[in-house]
A protein has these predicted regions:
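Single conserved hydrophobic/aromatic residue that forms the stacking wall/gate
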Residues: 172-184
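Phosphate-binding site recognition
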Residues: 1-174
Length: 184
């Protein structure tokens, strides 16, 4: 268990410990209803400071098999739903905050390589027998594991837009080639 794959860190508990918390666990009723459908790929694109990271932490705490969070969720809105235990702590979860990958990766252009390498290393700790020796692609690794075990993974990408945001910021804050030639 590591930083990305089935982390034992329950960041959602910190959210619940805060003085201000608005229960959005009702969203889990929806995500549970689409898990085994073609609608299972969900993109939560909202403005900054809209609670996306808290939602990502909630999804991780709810679905991850590395955590035991029944006591937490049974007291919240999702706990009132008929089948809230059906998917609770039943999945291998890979939770990646892209923003925190840029620096250790050595820059935005190395993030995918960094994620592939590190997540596959973590997967090997649990699924060594299921992975071919030279596996270097995360989609390939997940496909191999799923084919051999039948297990499903939940992949949560937080701050996925940081690469776009940062590139746009650089584009609009860097001097244009014309401006650079004038300043010489």
């Amino acid at each position: 268990m590591g930083r990305f794959f089935n982390s034992k860190v329950n960041a959602f508990q910190d959210v619940l410990n805060s003085k201000i918390y608005i229960d959005k666990t009702g969203l889990l009723e929806y995500t549970n209803s689409v898990i085994d459908t073609t609608s299972k790929f969900i993109c939560n694109s909202r403005p900054r400071r809209f609670g996306k990271s808290i939602t990502a932490d909630m999804l991780t705490a709810y679905y991850s098999r590395s955590l035991d969070t029944e006591e937490i969720f049974e007291k919240l809105e999702v706990g009132k739903t008929a089948d809230f235990r059906k998917h609770l702590n039943q999945y291998d979860v890979i939770h990646i905050d892209i923003q925190w990958c840029i620096e250790p990766a050595g820059g935005a252009d190395q993030v995918i390589t960094f994620i592939n390498k590190n997540v596959i290393e973590e997967l090997r700790e649990t699924y060594e027998k299921e992975l071919s020796e030279g596996t270097s692609s995360l989609p390939d690794a997940l496909s191999q594991i799923s084919a051999k075990t039948g297990k499903k993974f939940i992949l949560i990408l937080d701050e996925w837009d940081v690469l776009i945001r940062d590139e746009a910021c650089l584009l609009y804050t860097s001097p244009s080639p014309r401006d650079r030639s004038v300043s010489r």
